[in-house]
Amino acid sequence: EVQLQQSGPELVKPGASVKISCKASGYTFTDYYMNWVKQSHGKSLEWIGDINPNNGGTSYNQKFKGKATLTVDKSSSATYMELRSLTSEDSAVYYCARGYGYDPFDVWGTGTTVTVSS
């Protein structure tokens, strides 16, 4: 069974950083790009960026450049997203999603809730 297991909820203070993980199983990890998506309450999904597990190459939505950094660890079939300089606008559920190019994302992670509050 193909699964994307994400790390648990995070409560962080404004100005801090957070790093969340997405561990893949049930398929050849390097065969698919991994995408990250933001779901804010009452808003549409926003694509943050993607990472190529083969070489760590990344592509970002301009809006999230400087906010998000994607990394990969092939040895553990995991990708990571670090969010920095957090504000209340960054409070959301973040998903990893398997996909390539313009194909629809076919497998989604469990989601990680990030709450930014003092």
Curated annotation (Swiss-Prot):
UniProt key word Transmembrane: no
Molecular-function GO term, any one: antigen binding
Region (D segment): 99-104
Region (J segment): 105-118
SMART domains associated with the record: IG, IGv
Region: V segment, residue numbers: 1-98
SUPFAM superfamilies per record: Immunoglobulin
Protein keywords: Adaptive immunity, Disulfide bond, Immunity, Immunoglobulin
Keyword Disulfide bond assigned: yes
GO biological process: immunoglobulin mediated immune response
Bridged cysteine pairs (disulfide): C22-C96
Cellular component per GO, a single term: immunoglobulin complex
Superkingdom of the organism of origin: Eukaryota
UniProt-listed Pfam families: V-set
Protein name stated in the entry: Ig heavy chain V region AC38 205.12
Originating species: Mus musculus (Mouse)
